[in-house]
Swiss-Prot record:
Organism: Streptococcus gordonii (strain Challis / ATCC 35105 / BCRC 15272 / CH1 / DL1 / V288)
Gene encoding the protein: xpt
Annotated catalysed reactions: XMP + diphosphate = xanthine + 5-phospho-alpha-D-ribose 1-diphosphate
Major enzyme class: transferase
Any GO MF annotation of the entry: xanthine phosphoribosyltransferase activity
GO CC, any one term: cytoplasm
Cell location: Cytoplasm
The protein's name in its UniProt record: Xanthine phosphoribosyltransferase
Pathway linked to the protein: Purine metabolism; XMP biosynthesis via salvage pathway; XMP from xanthine: step 1/1
Length: 193
């Protein structure tokens, strides 16, 4: 997605050898116009897949996921990272390691929101090592639902996430694919859309 790549080049900051900070439009402050366009691109790609739910993980995946769900006309569910006292029964969980935060969290979704008849599109802000998406796939499978595809806003292709997910049989579609960081700059590879 050319507009997304242009925004990354303009407003993204490379930190070290493998971190991209995009807090001005995605991970802290949200550019809803851009998120709406991202949601529409994902909806255009997956509109014939029979998607019944969009699933993401809190927090930065919520904005692109909600606009994708809106464009598809389906509900959006986000996995919670913190234990919630109101979620008391039928909880589906998975362990997820965060590359950026360097911590493992137990993420959860109330089982009543997913059923075996659901065809799920996973949406996330970043793909690095693939652990967040893998955890969501695990939760969706616990519900007996099917994962139709995984939509990623920004993929760091030099990390192992895509391989991990594709080796598990998942279709991965990334709107921006970063091949490498070179001299503090982003070098893009060919995106999927």
């Amino acid at each position: 997605m050319k507009k997304l790549e242009e925004r990354i080049l303009r407003d993204g900051n490379v930190l070290g050898e493998n971190i991209l900070k995009v807090d001005s439009f995605l991970t802290h402050q949200v550019d809803f116009t851009l998120m709406k366009e991202i949601g529409q691109v994902f909806a255009d790609i997956f509109h014939e897949s029979g998607i019944t739910k969009v699933v993401t993980i809190e927090a930065s995946g919520i904005a692109p996921a909600v606009y994708t769900a809106e464009a598809l006309g389906v509900p959006m569910i986000f996995a919670k990272k913190a234990k919630n006292i109101t979620m008391t029964e039928g909880i589906l969980t998975a362990e997820v390691y965060s590359f950026t935060k360097q911590v493992t969290s137990t993420v959860s979704i109330a089982g009543k929101f997913l059923s075996p008849s659901d065809k799920v599109l996973v949406i996330d802000d970043f793909l690095a090592n693939g652990q967040a998406a893998k955890g969501l796939v695990e939760i969706i499978r616990q519900a007996g639902a099917s994962v139709e595809a995984i939509g990623i806003v920004i993929e760091k292709s030099f990390q192992s996430g895509r391989k991990l997910l594709e080796d598990d049989g998942q279709r991965v579609v990334s709107l921006a694919r970063i091949e490498k960081f070179e001299n503090g700059k982003v070098v893009f590879g060919k995106a999927d859309a």
